[in-house]
Design a protein with these regions (language model features):
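Core dinuclear metal-dependent hydrolase active-site scaffold
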Residues: 17, 120-146
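Metallo-beta-lactamase
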Residues: 44-54, 81-131
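Active-site metal-binding loops of divalent metal-dependent hydrolases
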Residues: 26-28, 51, 76-77, 136-137, ...
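C-terminal regulatory/interaction regions
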Residues: 224-275
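Residue-level marker for buried hydrophobic side chains located in beta-strands
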Residues: 22-24, 47, 71, 150-152, ...
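Conserved beta-strand hairpin/beta-sheet module of binuclear metal-dependent hydrolase folds
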Residues: 1-39, 143-155
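Divalent-metal (often Zn2+) His-rich catalytic cores of metallo-beta-lactamase-fold enzymes
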Residues: 182-230
Length: 275
């Protein structure tokens, strides 16, 4: 696990160097200077769980730097790597134009010929089995390492920052789908992984326990948001963090799961369900 030291903080965004130049989710380009020159060999493939900037934002910059680099991503996410205009507009609405460069750095397009589109139907690539696991994002996939049994789950198993056991489900807009997420947790469980490899942050050595934790938290948060009381939801979310984590870790939890975004994603989910 490479700690990308996003915004100068440890334990927020991890990039997984698996083997032989394979990287799962390189993170944002704003954090690349913290780690890219320390690699023993050039990366040859990026395995993206999804295209959100905290996971995949550096892809275009890395492809430009390493001429043999291939990028694997779900077929629904591939067009947005090639032309990131819509992705950037969506992120700018969420974070504000004044914060985009500080948070994420350059988001460069990836040439189409360098992208391999995946279906997530159980195909095997680069020693991984790939399963489509929507819920956090419609194009999210999980990679099961067929050698180690580790499952690289992106955001599907939640945010859990050591040394604390608190699990938060990241639910930013616009594509959160609670029903799909719950189904995807069953898909991940069915892979019978040895460990879950989390982007935020580290490893979950007891996969079923972690999946149960994110399932419970997701259902609880969704129910709170459905009541329509934004202030009550945000108060409960903030209090949960502060009751468990020390102040330094609490900052990291909020960096990985900005509370207002968690409300916005679930509020949009319920609103669209009712349309």
């Amino acid at each position: 696990l490479i700690d990308t030291m996003h915004l100068g903080r440890d334990r927020v965004i991890g990039a997984h160097l698996v083997r032989d130049g394979l990287i799962v989710d390189p993170g944002p380009s704003s954090a690349l200077p913290n780690w890219i020159d320390e690699l023993d060999e050039p990366p040859r493939a990026l395995m993206l769980t999804h295209i959100h900037l905290d996971h995949a934002g550096a892809s275009g910059v890395l492809v430009r730097r390493y001429e043999d680099l291939t990028v694997y991503v779900h077929e629904a996410g591939a067009p947005h790597l090639v032309d990131p205009e819509k992705l950037l507009k969506s992120a700018t609405r969420l974070y504000g134009e004044e914060n985009m460069n500080r948070l994420w750095g350059e988001v460069a397009p990836v040439p189409a010929e360098r992208v391999v589109a995946l279906t997530g139907s159980g195909e095997e690539v680069e020693g991984f089995r790939v399963e489509h696991t929507p819920g956090h994002a419609s194009h999210h996939v999980t990679y099961l390492d067929l050698g180690s049994g580790d499952a690289f789950v992106g955001d599907m198993a939640g945010v859990r920052i050591p040394p604390y056991d608190l699990t938060l489900p990241p639910t930013p807009p616009p594509e959160v789908d609670v029903e799909a997420w719950l189904h995807s947790l069953e898909t991940i469980s069915g892979l019978e992984p040895e460990r879950l490899r989390l982007t935020h942050f580290g490893d979950a050595a007891e996969p079923e326990r972690q999946l149960d934790a994110v399932r419970e938290a997701l259902q609880r948060n969704a129910a709170l948001v459905r009541r329509g009381d934004r202030e009550a939801f945000l108060d409960a979310f903030e209090r949960e963090i502060d009751d468990i984590a020390d102040p330094e870790t609490a900052v990291r939890l909020r960096q990985a799961t900005p509370p207002e975004q968690q409300w916005l994603g679930l509020e949009r989910y319920w609103r669209k369900r009712e349309e």
